[in-house]
């Protein structure tokens, strides 16, 4: 049975527009390549952070809603988001059935 997830991540603010699109496409691709079905992938825009993260005061928020049968896609996203210099913070939420 497919579980519903919501992922929110923040992209560093000093990124070029085309680089930002490439980051979003890359991470959407990571999810779909590992078996997830993306329902919605939307940009929330540039927002001020509640506190400073890696010397940044703001960032570009992005939200992805998806269905996944196995946690493989989520685990791979989580692993790669942690080592990406472009993503300064991310959070995965499993929605209740």
Swiss-Prot record:
Transmembrane segment boundaries: none
Gene Ontology CC entries for this record: cytoplasm; ribonucleoprotein complex; ribosome
Keywords: Ribonucleoprotein, Ribosomal protein, RNA-binding, rRNA-binding
Alphabetical list of CDD domains matching this protein: bS6
GO BP term (any one): translation
HAMAP family reported in the protein's UniProt record: Ribosomal_bS6 (MF_00360)
Membership in a protein family: Belongs to the bacterial ribosomal protein bS6 family.
The name this protein goes by in its record: Small ribosomal subunit protein bS6
């Amino acid at each position: 049975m497919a579980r519903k997830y919501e992922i929110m991540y923040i992209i560093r603010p000093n990124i070029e527009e085309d680089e930002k699109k490439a980051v979003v496409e890359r991470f959407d691709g990571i999810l779909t390549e590992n078996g997830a079905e993306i329902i919605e992938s939307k940009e929330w825009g540039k927002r001020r952070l509640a506190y400073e993260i890696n010397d940044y005061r703001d960032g570009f928020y992005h939200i992805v809603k998806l269905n996944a049968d196995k946690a493989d896609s989520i685990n791979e996203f989580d692993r790669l988001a942690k080592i990406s210099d472009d993503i300064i913070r991310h959070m995965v939420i499993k929605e209740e059935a």
